Regions:
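Key DNA-contact positions within bacterial/archaeal DNA-binding proteins
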Residues: 41-42, 57
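Short hydrophobic/aromatic patch on the recognition helix
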Residues: 43-44, 48
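Short, surface-exposed, polar/charged, turn-prone segments marking secondary-structure boundaries
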Residues: 35-36, 49, 58
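Terminal helix-turn-helix DNA-binding modules in bacterial transcription factors
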Residues: 1-39, 62-63
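Alpha-helical DNA-recognition elements
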Residues: 50-51, 62
Length: 63
């Protein structure tokens, strides 16, 4: 506990996006964001950075 419902949902979505990036390295960041439940790439990037400390493209490039 100790986190808001929206933070919980975003954390779940970010974990799914990380799984998708690992499983489908040729998928675009936009596609990963949409498939993870984000309607905006900027919202996805902001949530991803908040949860992981890095932006999606850096995460992908450092895997």
């Amino acid at each position: 506990l100790g986190q808001s419902f929206s933070d919980y949902v975003n954390q779940f979505r970010i974990e799914e996006s990380k799984r998708l990036m690992d499983a489908e390295p040729n998928a675009s960041i936009q596609e990963i964001a949409e498939r993870s439940g984000f309607h905006s790439i900027s919202t996805f990037r902001r949530a991803f950075q908040k949860c992981t400390g890095t932006i999606p493209s850096d995460y992908r490039n450092n895997r």
